[in-house]
Amino acid sequence: MKVSCEDINGPRSSLSRAWNHMSWLYYQYLLVTALYMLEPWERTIFNSMLVSIVGMALYTGYIFMPQHILAILHYFEIVQ
């Protein structure tokens, strides 16, 4: 008879499954970007710069995109 961890400990909670999935996604991020080769302080600097750049891009898009879209709609006379 085969006994699994779920038989002994009961069903895994959704929080545990979510945590494992997030850990797997972070591991994939480290592998795809080759950050696993960096020292922890280098990884922190890289991630900080990445978050800053993405944050600035999202903020700029949020502030300026409505104006540009409205200008395009006026140009093509979709909106008067």
From Swiss-Prot:
One GO BP annotation of this record: sphingolipid metabolic process
Positions on the Lumenal side per record topology: 39-43
Topological relation to the membrane, as annotated: Multi-pass membrane protein
Pfam families on file: SPT_ssu-like (PF11779)
Compartments where located: Endoplasmic reticulum membrane
Residue stretches spanning the membrane: 22-38, 44-66
Ranges facing Cytoplasmic side: 1-21, 67-80
Family per similarity comment: Belongs to the SPTSS family. SPTSSA subfamily.
Subunit structure: Component of the serine palmitoyltransferase (SPT) complex, which is composed of SPTLC1, SPTLC2 or SPTLC3 and SPTSSA or SPTSSB. The heterodimer consisting of SPTLC1 and SPTLC2/SPTLC3 forms the catalytic core of the enzyme, while SPTSSA or SPTSSB subunits determine substrate specificity. SPT also interacts with ORMDL proteins, especially ORMDL3, which negatively regulate SPT activity in the presence of ceramides.
UniProt protein name: Serine palmitoyltransferase small subunit A
